[in-house]
UniProtKB/Swiss-Prot annotation:
PPR repeats lie at residues 130-160, 166-200, 201-235, 236-270, 271-305. The lineage of its organism: Eukaryota, Viridiplantae, Streptophyta, Embryophyta, Tracheophyta. It comes from Arabidopsis thaliana (Mouse-ear cress). Keywords: Chloroplast, Plastid, Repeat, Transit peptide. Residues 1-88 form a transit peptide. This is Pentatricopeptide repeat-containing protein At4g14190, chloroplastic. It is found in: Plastid, Chloroplast.
Length: 501
């Protein structure tokens, strides 16, 4: 047990009241979720994080401990504060207080102060000059990409204290250099490790594979695998999942599938993020059969699909005119652990609207009503486009009236639908007069409709004309000063149509 110094005791005696708790949480927590996203390389390493509090000594008084820790944090937060001066004033810090200071400096991006504080603190007690403490300091510096400081600490432990760097220290340095694309430096320390009698492990090569994937050096991944085998490192499930993800991101589908088959034949664990990577790769190349097979596995396993990936799948179906699949996709993401989102309803409405199926559209609308799903701009415009395809002007008028009563916000797409219909056989005079009366046409132009609607239906004549007149007005005094309202935009479109021969 460490005793409190006189300076610490006198400093606590000056506190008039209990200070607020420190602005950080000393306990680590892991959040569990059923939603998966494709991880970046840094998340794939399997080494357990070093605990900042792992070797903290028990303070004389828990109350005094928290008071001093809080006071120390406040003093560090002051403008112009110097941790070395504070250490001198306090005489010494316990391990718990020291690592709290290091974490504060790290979170405050004061990385250049970490090593001087560590050097001063460790020299106060010879037992602090240890491989474990150096490992933690070097790990922090490598994670923050402060490699010059990390290497200085690395050289100090070898040259000044004749300590042998651990495998974890070498891995931190190798992975950090590789992640920055500095592979020459990474290989230097890999060889340095071997020269010092430490053999790389699977995790060492996993980090290199991650980095090569990040920098799209896929041929180097293959060479890395050969070096891995020559060093006697066996690929485990982490390595195989990693390889599948990296090859899928690079669009190397053949290699991706080879790694997948190897993993499955060895009955290793297939990670959810790996399946998601494969699905995205198949969608990217428009391989519908394989895309659907993988998507069905994901939904069956209850893995949530990211909205961006769902949109990518939907666009593949739309580009291939496979509109009926949109309903299946919408139902699929609703049935999985993903809750019924607006996107799911959008897909289902789009399916039947694009197929011009009144029965299907009415059925989905009924389901929405039963589920008490509120209407929005996208839903409204999908229904309006469907009715316009059917030539059902009565339903259009009724829906517009209902939308007004329900206070559903309309946008430029809605205006465009009515405008284009007015050019045909629909009498939109009453609609425009109502919009003018309630002030809608004098509002700034907005585009709230989901882009999938444009992908499925294309842009109408009015929207294309709007883009033309807007492009013509860009850079002009009138275009910069005039407020772009629906009324103003319609006037410009009409004027432009009259001037076009």
């Amino acid at each position: 047990m460490e005793n409190l110094t006189t300076a610490q005791f006198l400093h606590r005696a000056t506190l008039l009241k209990k200070p607020p708790p420190p602005p950080w949480n000393l306990n680590s927590s892991f959040l569990t979720s059923t939603s998966y996203s494709i991880p970046r390389p840094s998340s794939l390493r399997r080494s357990l994080p070093l605990s900042i509090n792992g070797d903290a000594t028990q303070p004389t008084s828990l109350l005094h401990h928290h008071r001093f820790l809080s006071s120390l944090t406040r003093r560090l937060s002051l403008s112009g504060s110097c941790p070395l001066r504070l250490l001198q004033e306090d005489g010494d810090w316990s391990k718990d207080h020291f690592w709290a200071v290091i974490r504060f400096l790290r979170q405050s991006s004061r990385l250049h102060e970490i090593l001087p504080v560590f050097d001063t603190w460790k020299n106060l007690e010879p037992s602090r000059i240890s491989e474990n403490n150096y490992e933690r300091i070097i790990r922090f510096l490598c994670e923050e990409k402060s490699m010059s400081e990390a290497i200085r600490a690395f050289r100090s432990m070898i040259d000044d204290h004749e300590l042998s760097p651990s495998l974890e220290i070498y891995n931190s340095i190798i992975h950090s250099y590789a992640d920055d694309g500095k592979f020459e430096e990474a290989m230097f320390y890999l060889n340095h490790m071997k020269e010092n009698g430490l053999l790389p492990i699977t995790e060492t090569y996993d980090g290199l594979i991650e980095a090569y994937g990040k920098w799209k050096m896929y041929d180097e991944i293959v060479l890395c695998l050969k070096r891995m085998e020559s060093d006697g490192c066996v690929r485990d499930h982490v390595t195989y999942n990693l390889l599948i993800r990296e090859f899928s991101r690079g669009g190397l589908l053949k290699r991706m599938e080879q790694m997948y088959q190897s993993l499955m034949s060895r009955k290793m664990t297939l990670e959810p993020s790996t399946l998601l990577s494969m699905l995205e790769a198949y969608a990217e190349f428009g391989l519908i059969e394989k895309m659907e097979e993988t998507c069905n596995k994901i939904i069956r396993f209850g893995i949530s699909l990211d909205e961006g990936l769902v949109r990518k799948l939907a666009n593949v179906y739309i580009e291939n005119l496979m509109f009926s699949r949109l309903d299946d996709l919408g139902r699929g993401i609703s049935a999985s652990r993903t809750r019924r989102t607006e996107l799911a309803w959008c897909l289902r409405l789009l399916c039947h609207a694009r197929l011009v199926s009144r029965k299907g559209l009415d059925y989905v609308v009924k389901e929405m009503e039963e589920a008490r799903v509120p209407w929005n701009t996208t839903f409204a415009n999908i229904a309006l486009l469907a009715y316009s395809k059917m030539g059902d002007f009565t339903s259009i008028e009724l829906l517009l009236s209902e939308l007004r009563i329900k206070h559903v916000k309309l946008d430029l797409v809605t205006v465009g639908i009515v405008f284009d219909l007015s050019e045909a056989r629909f009498d939109g005079t009453g609609v425009f007069m109502t919009w003018k009366k309630i002030g809608f046409l004098d509002k700034p132009v907005e585009m709230k409709t989901d882009p999938l609607v444009h992908a499925a239906f294309g842009k109408g004549q009015f929207l294309r004309s709007c883009e033309e007149v807007k492009n013509q007005s860009l850079g002009t005094r009138d275009g910069e000063s005039k407020s772009w309202t629906y009324q103003y935009l319609m006037e410009l479109v009409v004027k432009n149509q009259k001037t076009v021969p």
